[in-house]
């Protein structure tokens, strides 16, 4: 069970969206090895810690602290720790995705969001995160794709068909990313996408 804990924690936090968007920006620029995976995963982890800090603080205050002090039982601590994570997931989940998993679980239509079991919320949250990450990735890809198309068109019109367009477009894509302060914009968009 403990070996599944890291995977479970990754799936119910902001990590999924962040790592997918960071991976897509790396591919959009055209340098699949830069930044290296360790840097990308480290950045994704620290951004996840940043985004999830209010949830972790609430868990510390309402569940972990009282449990270690002996004021509440383990079952109460679990219940109180689950509540902020559920709230975080429910703020991000799409209604359509939640309805899909309520239907697939063959549950009666819940009257309130609190009636939806956590085992239904988690997969709905995951596919909502995937959809959001791919939407953000698409928006990031478009300007870089335009640069590739323009460079390809110019090279074709000059009769330079043997020269790979990526070789010419890469410096322009890096220049664009640096000129618009891409890391700043990307981090800002990622963090604000969770509010």
What residues fall within each predicted segment?
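Hydrophobic alpha-helical segments and their helix-loop boundaries in membrane
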Residues: 1-195
